[in-house]
Structure formats: structure tokens, C-alpha cells
Amino acid sequence: MLKQRTIKSVVKTVGIGLHSGRKVTLTLRPAAPGNGIIFTRVDLDPAVEIPATASAIGDTRLASVLQKDGARVSTVEHLMSACAGLGIDNLYVDVDAEEIPIMDGSAASFVFLLQSAGIEEQGAAKRFIRVIKPVEVRDGDKLARLEPYFGFKLSFTIEFRHPAVDKTGQTFEIDFADTSYTREIARARTFGFAHEVEMLREIGLARGGSLDNAIVLDEHRMLNNDELRYGDEFVRHKILDAIGDLYVVGYPLIAAYTAHKSGHGLNNALLRALLADEAAYEIVTFDKVEEAPRAFLPQLQPAFS
């Protein structure tokens, strides 16, 4: 039986909120089978638990934001991406602010944190959402689509028309049947443009943004002194974001995802469209491990870790 996973022990870190610029303490705790991933605002009285679900995603303008009863947890996509990449089904995420710390702008710190806590299998079958007919959403020239595929692969195309981005490649495709999330995706950093950062700061946002946690571009070049972590780091980060955005559906997806200029909002609209059509998906488990898609096999976990 392919089993659910959680972490073995409690682990904690401190980082900076991207928009508030304030110190944020993040604590990850093991959770029981079937629990899912639950974010808790422990700084509120009483504390507010917000399950990571597609319907709980509210604001998507700058990040994926979970909302419940007026409480918010922003910028969840990088941590959710790491959980997807390591096959974590059940987890408590305690945070003492309204955003997850940005760390280095990628998912690498969260992968390290989860691996440091240890990952263990639980005595319940891992559940998947298998897409059985295509679902597509559009917004102008933007597109996001899920199609039947016995595995998990993603294809993403961006169009930024910037010298630094143009020369790195604007399309990337990855199939986790034979590719490592940790090696090929997790270290890709978020990116932005200097003039946009200044505009955000004028309205009280992006106060924690810096060259330490993002790739920053002016009109012509990259302002960071360090090299890109991948030759096509920009589009790989969009894949990283998409993996995190899609994981709030509640279970790993058995599907092929294709996107053109998609973002957090369109990714969430895609999940809602999928869940609204009961003929488009089914919930499945695998009693025999060898019958599961290769991307999710435990002995090949490094291929999706």
C-alpha cells in the first residue's frame, strides 16, 4: 500500500515576512493520517486554524493567501511546493504572523526543514486526485490546463520580454517520473522588477524583499551579484509556484499540467473548475505500491524529493 506521510519531529525556524519585513516564527509539527496540511495563526487569541484547501484561497494578487474568519496566512505556495515535492500529506504549520517567511525566495529552505524533521510513513493509504478528463481555464491570453496522465508532469511558458529573461529560456517541462524536485526545482528563486518593488513599498508592501530573497531586475539586467542557480531559473520558479498552488487541492494530482503566463489566481481557478466537475476527476489509492505512478513510488522518493 502506498502510504500517507508526515514528519517525525517538531522543527522550527525564524525568517522575514516578504511584505511586512517583520520577523516570523514558523513551526512544523507532525499530523495524524487524513489531517491534511493545516496552517494555524498562533499569534491570534483564540488561534485560528486554516486548512490548506482550494476554497480557502482568497487574495491571489501577489501570492497565494489562505483566509478564514478574517484571519490570513499569505505566501504559502513555496512551503506547499516543498510539501508536494517531498510527498508530505499531513502537517501542522504554526505561524505567528500573517505570512510565511520568505527565506531565500525558493523552496529549498523548506525542503531542508522538512528533511531535518525526518519523514515517516503512516498507517493509512495515500489518496490522490486522478484527472480523468481535461479541464482548462483562460484569462485573456493566459491559460492553465489539467489533462489525464498517469504520473505528474508540468509544462510552463512565460513571456516577460526582458533581456535577462529572454536569454534563459521561457518554456520548461518536467516529468517527476524521472526527475528530482529537490535538484531541479526547489532552489529556483522568486523574481521581480525593481520599479515594481518600489511601487509596492510605497503602499506598505515588499518591506522584507531584498537581493537575499529574490532575483531583482532593472530594465536591462539582473541586479544580484550571484549567478542564476539554473540556466532557466525564472520559468523554473513559475513551475515551483504552480506545484505549490496545485497542492492546495488536498491531495497529489495524477495529471499533466500545462500553463501559459499563468499565476496564483488562474491556478486556483483551475482547481476550482476541476472540483466543480465531478466527472473530471476521481479519488484513488494504490493497494500495491508498484501499481502507483512512478513519480510517487517510495523507493524512488529521491526522484520527487
From Swiss-Prot:
The reaction(s) this protein catalyses: a UDP-3-O-[(3R)-3-hydroxyacyl]-N-acetyl-alpha-D-glucosamine + H2O = a UDP-3-O-[(3R)-3-hydroxyacyl]-alpha-D-glucosamine + acetate
Cofactor dependency: Zn(2+)
Transmembrane residue ranges: none
Any one annotated GO CC term: membrane
Protein keywords: Hydrolase, Lipid A biosynthesis, Lipid biosynthesis, Lipid metabolism, Metal-binding, Zinc
Molecular function per GO: metal ion binding; UDP-3-O-acyl-N-acetylglucosamine deacetylase activity
Pathway(s) this gene product operates in, as recorded in its UniProt entry: Glycolipid biosynthesis; lipid IV(A) biosynthesis; lipid IV(A) from (3R)-3-hydroxytetradecanoyl-[acyl-carrier-protein] and UDP-N-acetyl-alpha-D-glucosamine: step 2/6
Gene3D superfamilies with a match to the protein in the record: lpxc deacetylase, domain 1, lpxc deacetylase, domain 2
A Pfam family: LpxC
Keyword set includes Transmembrane: no
Annotated Zn(2+) binding sites: H78, H237, D241
SUPFAM superfamilies recorded: Ribosomal protein S5 domain 2-like (SSF54211)
Keyword Amino-acid biosynthesis tagged: no
Residue stretches in coiled coil: none
Entry EC number(s): 3.5.1.108
Cross-referenced InterPro entries: Ribosomal_Su5_D2-typ_SF (IPR020568), UDP-acyl_GlcNac_deAcase (IPR004463), UDP-acyl_GlcNac_deAcase_C (IPR011334), UDP-acyl_N-AcGlcN_deAcase_N (IPR015870)
Residues at the catalytic site: H264 (proton donor)
Source organism, top-level taxon: Bacteria
GO biological process annotation, one example: lipid A biosynthetic process
NCBIfam families xrefs: lpxC
Functional summary from the UniProt entry: Catalyzes the hydrolysis of UDP-3-O-myristoyl-N-acetylglucosamine to form UDP-3-O-myristoylglucosamine and acetate, the committed step in lipid A biosynthesis.
Similarity field: Belongs to the LpxC family.
Protein name per Swiss-Prot or TrEMBL: UDP-3-O-acyl-N-acetylglucosamine deacetylase
